[in-house]
A protein has these predicted regions:
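C-terminal single-pass membrane-anchor helix
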Residues: 101-130
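Structure-specific nucleic-acid interaction/processing domains
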Residues: 2-15, 22-102
Length: 130
């Protein structure tokens, strides 16, 4: 028994794909205590999903397939191959753990850009009035 798992952010983007021949709880404990990914990656994780496979080879193959399909931000480039030509039916992803509430893309803040636009607009109005 093996698993392919993915980390998703609050916008429901796949940000990392991995596989394990261990129990999911053991692998997640490794990730979140002494993980090899950046702190930025781990702090961006909102949900963890997985698919269970019969063999480790199946899980490894599907990891590579999903990395090429989703092109996750935190996977290493050497596992990406734009020339992958197979298409596989995806099993249903099951949720392992939800860490943060997902945000609809329309609800997302524009951050700094919003502040710049508001400041520019206020300045333009001020110039017209005075």
């Amino acid at each position: 028994m093996a698993f392919t798992y993915r980390f998703k952010d609050i916008y429901d983007n796949t940000i990392y794909v991995g596989y394990t021949g261990q129990q999911m709880s053991e692998r997640m404990n490794q990730h979140f205590t002494k993980g090899h990914l950046s702190k930025d990656c781990y702090s961006s994780v909102a949900k963890i999903e997985y698919i269970k496979w019969k063999t480790k080879s199946d899980a490894q193959l599907m990891e590579i397939y999903f990395i090429n399909k989703y092109k996750p931000r935190y996977n290493k480039q050497n596992k990406r191959n734009d020339k992958l030509t197979i298409t596989l039916d995806e099993k249903e992803w099951k949720t392992y753990q939800v860490l943060k509430k997902q945000v609809e893309k329309s609800e997302a803040s524009w951050g700094c850009l919003t502040w710049v636009l508001i400041t520019s607009l206020v300045y333009a109005i001020y110039q017209l009035l005075f």
